[in-house]
């Protein structure tokens, strides 16, 4: 398979090409990889392995945030990024997401558990039901849902 380093170099340089920028020199790319992998405490040995081959669940999640750091998207959608993570990996991944947040980008984090929000403070919390946003609020909404569940919202929802 393709190594993480080669995959990321190709992705980063294609993105730079699209923006009319020169490809990164090898030394610049390696420096960038070291800086970005430090954000999620990604073991440098993983970058020489094939993409996600033999990665643990936590390593895959860290790798997703590492890729996000390398590509610096304007919009990132993280679907249950907390799924299957132990508390240490959850903290590392969430801290990485928080460090990458700027005024120039947006991250949509989909989760069913409030514990992720102990580390990522959302600007807004939306509750989706049957494909629609039925309720919005701040972090306190997530805390209430953790305590009381969703029934109180769904019972009040009229299609």
Regions found by a protein language model. Name each.
Residues 1-74:
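ABC-family P-loop ATPase nucleotide-binding domains
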Residues 76-78:
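Hydrophobic residue in the Walker B motif beta-strand
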Residues 80-81, 88:
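Walker B catalytic motif
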Residues 86-91, 136:
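Conserved D-loop-proximal element of ABC-family nucleotide-binding domains
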Residues 89, 113-116, 120-121:
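Helical "lid/switch" subdomain of P-loop NTPase nucleotide-binding domains
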Residues 90-103:
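Helical segment within the ABC ATPase nucleotide-binding domain
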Residues 104-112:
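Conserved H-loop
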Residues 119, 124, 128, 132-155:
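Conserved beta-strand-loop-alpha-helix hinge in the C-terminal portion
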